[in-house]
């Protein structure tokens, strides 16, 4: 029987499952190199943690790793039901909050290594977390697309740690009771991008679709469709970073000004940015709450031990 130790949290309603132990050794390379080893040789550990019967489509996994740099607090590899993520904002907030719960860090500034670079996270005295993300930028503005069943769509392509297609003029109602329609629309957009061969820089797959709408209490409300068909319950850290890159490029938000991004369920991130060569460096602040500590058990004769559909 195999055992995998986990600690679950949620950030603004979006769950993160931190894997503390039980995965095979991935070597001593960078987080990107270790992610590649995990994907190539041990992917069934991802599916065991994330897919049913132990997980769900909305769950994001985070494998805790020893960092390469001696001044880093931890390394982490993010994954979900469809594969691997370069970076995850809500997940980083959850990881930092959980590291404090484990007694590994105190309030202060900490460096976290990810497959797309090292991010700086500040654990505040109230246990909220600010994540200084990897650089973000807008790759293309006003990209036109024809989506069957919906007609013409125009959006921006931006990098915030993952690739996003951001749409403000979409005609959809961004609300928690309209998730099914939002999912269908965003999924059709993503399929349209793939059919048209539209990508991020260097052929990067645009696997996140982000829809924006006005919000009576905050600067914006968003719906984010993640890889697969799960939507982000949080405002999405990498998605908010991509949004800031577009706002900065359009001159609509000054460096240091706070942008309050609400999610489709009403949870909120506070975000700002500083300028950097070719783009911006965003900072996202939010809170995570602990929800479980558990040991996942994988019996040798369990036909679904490594996940349904794996």
Curated annotation (Swiss-Prot):
Its function?
Answer: Catalyzes the epimerization of trans-4-hydroxy-L-proline (t4LHyp) to cis-4-hydroxy-D-proline (c4DHyp). Is likely involved in a degradation pathway that converts t4LHyp to alpha-ketoglutarate. Displays no proline racemase activity.
Q: Report the sequence similarity comment from the record.
A: Belongs to the proline racemase family.
> Which keywords are on file for this protein?
Isomerase
Catalysed reaction per UniProt?
Answer: trans-4-hydroxy-L-proline = cis-4-hydroxy-D-proline
Q: Quote the protein name from its UniProt record.
A: 4-hydroxyproline 2-epimerase
| Family annotation (PANTHER family) | TRANS-3-HYDROXY-L-PROLINE DEHYDRATASE (PTHR33442:SF1)
EC numbers listed for it are 5.1.1.8
GO molecular function ontology, one term from the record:
4-hydroxyproline epimerase activity
Positions with a binding annotation for substrate: 89-90, 208, 232, 237-238
Q: What class of enzyme is it?
A: isomerase
- Stored SUPFAM superfamilies: Diaminopimelate epimerase-like
- Database matches in InterPro entries: Pro_racemase_fam
**Pfam families attached to this UniProt entry:** Pro_racemase
Annotated catalytic residues: 88 (proton acceptor), 236 (proton donor)
């Amino acid at each position: 029987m195999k055992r995998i130790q986990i600690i679950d949290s949620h950030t603004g309603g979006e769950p993160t499952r931190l894997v503390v132990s039980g995965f095979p050794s991935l070597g001593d390379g960078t987080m990107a190199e270790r992610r590649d080893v995990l994907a190539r040789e041990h992917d069934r550990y991802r599916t065991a943690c994330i897919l049913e019967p132990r997980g769900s489509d909305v769950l994001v996994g985070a494998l805790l790793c020893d960092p390469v740099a001696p001044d880093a607090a931890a390394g982490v590899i993010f994954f979900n039901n469809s594969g691997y993520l370069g970076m995850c904002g809500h997940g980083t907030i959850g990881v930092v909050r959980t590291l404090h719960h484990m007694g590994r860090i105190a309030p202060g500034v900490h460096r976290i290594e990810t497959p797309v670079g090292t991010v700086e996270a500040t654990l505040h005295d109230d246990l909220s977390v600010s994540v200084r993300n990897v650089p973000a930028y807008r790759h293309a503005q006003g990209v036109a697309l024809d989506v069957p069943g919906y007609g013409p769509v125009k959006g921006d392509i931006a990098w915030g740690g993952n690739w996003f297609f951001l749409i403000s003029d979409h005609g959809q109602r961004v609300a928690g009771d309209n998730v099914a329609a939002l999912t269908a629309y965003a999924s059709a957009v993503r399929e349209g991008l793939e059919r048209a061969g539209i990508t991020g820089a260097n052929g990067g797959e645009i696997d996140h679709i982000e829809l924006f709408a006005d919000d009576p209490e905050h600067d914006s409300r968003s719906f984010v469709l993640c890889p697969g068909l799960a939507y982000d319950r949080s405002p999405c850290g990498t998605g908010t970073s991509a949004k800031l890159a577009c706002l900065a490029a359009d001159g609509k938000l000054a460096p240091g000004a706070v942008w309050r991004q609400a999610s489709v369920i009403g949870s909120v991130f506070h975000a700002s940015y500083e300028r950097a060569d070719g783009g911006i460096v965003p900072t996202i602040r939010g809170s995570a709450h602990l929800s479980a500590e558990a040991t996942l058990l994988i019996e040798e004769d369990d036909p679904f031990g490594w996940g349904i559909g794996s």
